[in-house]
Amino acid sequence: MIVQTFSLDNLLNGDEEGVPDPLADYRKLSYRDQLEDLQRKHHDRERELVSQITDLLEDSLHLKPDPRIRHFLDDFTDAGEALLTHFDKEEQIVFPLMYIHLSYDSETIKEVDALTSEHREQEKKMDSLKSRMHLFETSDWNLLRELLEELFTDLSVHISKEDDITFPNYIDLVTRK
């Protein structure tokens, strides 16, 4: 059996040779449709995943207190709260500004840049959590591990869509006039 592996970053950026770009359809959308896609496909699902993961961790701690799991839950809660706040900022402030301002607006550009910086912080938090996935290697943790992996993968795709496609498309649109 031949197993072929791919770099998620290369795959998302269309750099894997012979592999179709999984974001090709997304790239074809207008930036406004991209914003709707981000909210509908990523924000909603990631909110749900954060809630499910938090509930599973809290339930497990009630059954069997473990300081390592408590520490992971605390860090996950901090990262989850930052993520949800970030989504609210995107949905309530930045995305509406991007809908309204079809010409250069320094405030909107500043907000987009701030979101990109927040993405770097969120990636650091997720990397820290990923580094502790060994805590969940036993079969007792299958569901939690699957949900965490889904969240990490979805966030990676989500951030790539925003930072590599949507935000640059928007900035290109408003600066070329």
Functional labels for PLM-detected ranges:
Residues 1-177:
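Small-residue-biased structural context
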